[in-house]
Amino acid sequence: MQEINGTSHLKMGIAITTYSNEKTSATRIQIIRDSLTSLKMFRNNVEVIIVVDGSYNTDHKKLLDEFNGDFEIIYREKNGGISKAKNTCIKLLLAKNIDIGFLADDDVLYCENWHNAYATSILNTKIDHFVYLPPQIYQSVLRKTTYNNIPVIECTSGGIAGCFMTFTPKIIQQIGYFRIYPYVYGCEHRDFSYRCLKNRLVPNIFDIDNSSNYLKLHHLSLDSSSIIVDKGGLALNIEKKKEYLNKFQEYVECIE
C-alpha cells in the first residue's frame, strides 16, 4: 500500500487481551503462541502490551514467560471481563502517547506491514476506527466501496467484528472507554463501534482494502477443539446468550 501521507512520524501501539483457565485446551494455547510469534516477527517499531485478564493456566504462563523479554506483559489482579481488560489496554496505550492504537484478541496472525497498512488508511480516509473483518466469517457479505476516494471494505449485513480494531486518542476523548454494560461476551466491541457511528466519528463500519494481506484470524480459532466447554450446560448457555443478546439489542436501539 502506498504511503500517500507517510506514517513514519506516527507513534503506534497495540494491546492484546489474553486469558485462560484450567479448561483451556492445548489447541488454544498454540493459537496464542502462533499469534504472538507472528507479532514478534512483524512488530517493527510498534509498542506492544499484553494484558492478561486475571487468569492463566500453567502452559499459558510458560508461554507468556517466553515472550517476557519481547513484549510488556501486564497481569490484571482478577478477571474483570473483556470490557475492563480492553479498557486497561486503552489506558496503557494512551499513557505511551500513541497516535494510533490497535486493540486485538490473542488469535490474530500478523503479516508484514500490517500496522502501516492500517495507519495509511487512517491518514488517507480520515477514519480513525477500522475493524478487521475476517473473510472466513464475513466473506459472503463483504463489499468493496470507497471513502474519500480510497478503497475500503464494508460488511453489508451490518456485522461488526471485534478481534482487531483501531482507535485514536480523539476517539476516546469523544466517546470514552468500553462500557461495562451489557455483560455479554462479544457485544462490548459492537457497543464501542456503534458509539463511534452515533457520534459521527466514522461514516460507517469499515475495514481497510485487502486487509487479509496484513491480518488473518487463526484458522483453528473457530474450531470447537480450541475451547473446551461444559457440554452438559451448553444448551443452557445458548439460551442465556440469546436472552442477553435480546437485552443488548434493546440497549442498542435505545442509544441510537
Curated annotation (Swiss-Prot):
Disulfide bonds: none annotated. Coiled coil: none annotated. GO terms for molecular function: glycosyltransferase activity. It comes from the Viruses. The keyword Transferase applies. InterPro entries: Glyco_trans_2-like (IPR001173), Nucleotide-diphossugar_trans (IPR029044). Keywords: Glycosyltransferase, Transferase. Its EC number is 2.4.-.-. It is an enzyme of class 2 (transferase). CDD domains: Glyco_tranf_GTA_type (cd00761). Belongs to the glycosyltransferase 2 family. This is Uncharacterized glycosyltransferase R363. It comes from Acanthamoeba polyphaga mimivirus (APMV).
